[in-house]
């Protein structure tokens, strides 16, 4: 039974779970989705919200400390926020919008703070980085070392590789229409691991460019 959203952590040695956050400013988390850690060990995450039969929540983007001491709602509202990532220099936050198939960027100006564009230039404060149009949806994302943003793309099934300036560098097509996630691994970070959700497969794909090392992981 659904009781709300939360951010939990697990002790890899014992397998024990503990809950860090269930709300922010007395507003319950609804459906935390994707997460990315910065170089300080704090993290940003998207909350897509709860989807019901005839309506859905307006989502949010949060920043929080990994010790459970502080959480901030940084961006709200944001319709269907999903994939989230940081630029190589940690100065730009990228957020993928699922339903519109759009990619937004935010300039990080301080700890847990972003610069927001005013309405009507932006409806959520972010810079619209890419909106290629057509029938598609964006899901999770990962970055290449050169700064390109690789976004898992639904409906037409593939990975949209978008430059920091917003240009579509390439579209890597797959047979599965529900490509939902991507991350980089292997010794040289030139192997992409991609989830094909319609067929329920995890794909291992050789990638032409090196993936961006994640903080505290690919070291």
Which residues does each predicted region cover?
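Beta-propeller fold detector
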Residues: 18-22, 72-76, 114-130, 170-173, ...
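A short loop-to-beta-strand structural motif that recurs across blades of beta-propeller domains
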Residues: 5-8, 59-62, 102-104, 158-160, ...
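Short, solvent-exposed loop/turn segments at conserved positions within beta-propeller repeat blades
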Residues: 1-5, 49-59, 98-101, 154-155, ...
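Loop/turn-rich, solvent-exposed surfaces of beta-rich toroidal or solenoidal domains
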Residues: 101-102, 106-110, 119-169
């Amino acid at each position: 039974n659904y009781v709300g959203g939360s951010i939990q952590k697990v002790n890899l040695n014992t397998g024990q779970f503990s809950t860090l956050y269930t709300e922010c400013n007395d507003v319950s988390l609804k459906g935390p989705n994707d997460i990315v850690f910065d170089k300080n060990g704090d993290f940003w995450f998207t909350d897509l919200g709860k989807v019901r039969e005839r309506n859905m929540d307006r989502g949010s983007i949060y920043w929080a400390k990994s010790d459970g001491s502080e959480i901030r709602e940084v961006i709200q509202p944001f319709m269907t926020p999903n994939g989230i990532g940081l630029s190589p220099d940690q100065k730009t936050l990228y957020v993928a919008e699922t339903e519109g198939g759009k990619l937004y960027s935010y300039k990080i100006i301080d700890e847990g703070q972003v610069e927001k564009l005013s309405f009507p230039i932006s409806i959520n404060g972010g810079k619209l980085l890419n909106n290629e149009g057509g029938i598609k949806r964006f899901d999770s994302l990962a970055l290449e070392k050169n700064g390109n943003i690789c976004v898992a793309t639904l409906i037409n099934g593939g990975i949209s590789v978008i430059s920091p300036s917003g240009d579509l560098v390439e579209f890597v097509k797959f047979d599965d229409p529900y490509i939902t996630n991507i991350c980089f691994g292997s010794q040289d970070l030139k192997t992409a691991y991609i989830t094909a959700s319609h067929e329920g497969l995890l794909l291992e794909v050789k990638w032409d460019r090196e993936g961006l090392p994640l903080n505290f992981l690919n070291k």
